[in-house]
Regions:
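N-terminal hydrophobic or amphipathic helices/low-complexity stretches enriched
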Residues: 14-59, 98-99
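A non-catalytic alpha/beta surface segment that caps or lines the substrate-entry region
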Residues: 43-103, 242-243
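Secretory targeting signatures
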Residues: 1-24, 317-354
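Active-site-adjacent substrate-binding region
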Residues: 198, 205-318
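Solvent-exposed loop/turn segments at secondary-structure junctions
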Residues: 53-56, 78, 84-89, 100-103, ...
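Loop/turn elements at helix/coil->beta-strand transitions in domains of secreted/extracellular proteins
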Residues: 41-44, 74-79, 104-108, 157-162, ...
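Extracytoplasmic/secreted proteins, especially bacterial periplasmic and envelope-associated proteins
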Residues: 28-31, 40-43, 47, 59-76, ...
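Acidic/histidine-rich catalytic neighborhood of metal-dependent amide-processing enzymes
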Residues: 129-225, 229
């Protein structure tokens, strides 16, 4: 069931970030930031963990893809599968799209991988036997992407916004994964001539390690602005999130690498960088102990809020009514997994003078 009540429209066009805070009503952005729900995020993580293992070569992989697709569709966001092969395994990406008002405008993308892995797996049988709950790696990222879709589902930008859950990011027992899903997606986008202004990949964002709410934003020479943009908006809105921006083109172990290789501006958001020692690496990585009780809800919420603020920071209003109430009530039941999603937020903003 999905109920959407909209009492005002919202139309946004893209402008440079350095003028965003003077052009964009800070209160509207703050309202969207406050709409991010830790309860919804943690419920999605729990649901994904409850699948036991989400290895891309298991039957559960298709069940998880269906679960994620159902989330997007229940928000009235157009969503579809993109099928690809990882070795001998047929796997699916889940792609949701909020279309922009300008077909020629570059796209934005939020992505995370939904498969998980246990480091002790050597055969397909091992994969069936050994748990890989993957709460941090990477249910945390997927839950954040789903939450961003919920909060942004009634906004209209000139730019199209994509939300993608990638399959087969992990190696797999036969090493046929290795970011096969994101590579397939990027190859398809390049073939279609799709351009992107910003791609944010979220991978392991929930482990706090006893530190304050934080994230490491890994960029390369083509995407340095994505880190500074996020720092600026988080600071401007007082979001409690410490951000370390690292230009590290040698860190290629997640889906952002597929976008870098295609020349797309992309940033990896991750809780630590083991190559530089920035923050504590999750010691439960790729084990049966990577569970939801090890995660910081506040940190994941802050990351989601920072991304909402960043997206709004590179947008400016075209026109709008004085205010509006948006209510989304979503109930999803797919197989043994269920979730209740409720988005309520009030948007108040001024009409931009021409």
């Amino acid at each position: 069931v999905c109920i959407v009540l909209v009492f005002a429209s919202l139309s946004i066009s893209v402008s440079p970030l350095n003028s965003a805070l003077t052009q964009y009503d800070r209160h509207a952005t703050s309202d969207l930031v406050e709409a991010v729900s830790g309860e919804r995020i943690m419920q999605t993580i729990q649901d994904l963990q409850d699948f036991g293992s989400r290895a891309f070569y298991l039957d559960s992989s298709e069940e998880v893809a269906s679960y994620i697709l159902g989330h997007f569709q229940a928000m009235n966001i157009a969503a579809e599968y993109q099928e690809f092969m990882a070795g001998i395994h047929s796997v699916k990406n889940v792609v949701a799209t909020i279309p922009g008002t300008s077909a020629s405008a570059p796209h934005f993308l939020f992505g995370a991988h939904y498969d998980s892995e246990n480091r002790y797996v050597r055969t397909a049988s091992d994969g069936q036997m050994l748990p890989a709950p993957g709460a941090d790696d990477d249910a945390s990222g997927v839950a954040c992407v789903v939450e961003l879709a919920c909060v942004l589902s009634n906004l209209r930008l000139q730019n199209t916004v994509r939300f993608v859950a990638f399959g087969a990011e992990e190696n797999g027992y036969d090493s046929s994964g290795r970011m096969a899903g994101s590579r397939s997606y990027v190859e398809s986008e390049k073939a279609k001539g799709t351009s992107y202004d910003a791609c944010w990949i979220l991978d392991m964002i929930g482990y706090g390690g006893g530190s304050e709410n934080h994230t490491v934003v890994v960029v390369n020479e083509d995407s340095t602005g994505l880190g500074s943009d996020m720092q600026e908006m988080v600071g401007a809105l007082g979001i409690e999130l410490s951000i370390v921006v690292e230009s590290n083109s040698s860190l290629l172990s997640s889906d952002h690498a597929s976008f870098w290789s295609a020349g797309y501006p992309a940033a990896l958001l991750i809780e630590s960088d083991p190559t530089t020692g920035a923050y504590q690496f999750n010691p439960y990585y790729h084990s049966a102990e990577d569970t939801i009780d090890k995660l910081s809800e506040g940190q994941i919420v802050a990351v989601a809020q920072g991304l909402v603020a960043t997206l709004m920071g590179i947008s400016s209003p075209e026109s709008s009514n004085e205010g509006g109430l948006v209510l989304i009530s979503v109930t999803i039941a797919i197989g043994s997994a269920s979730a209740v999603v409720v988005c309520i937020y009030y948007i108040k903003r001024k009409v931009k003078e021409k």
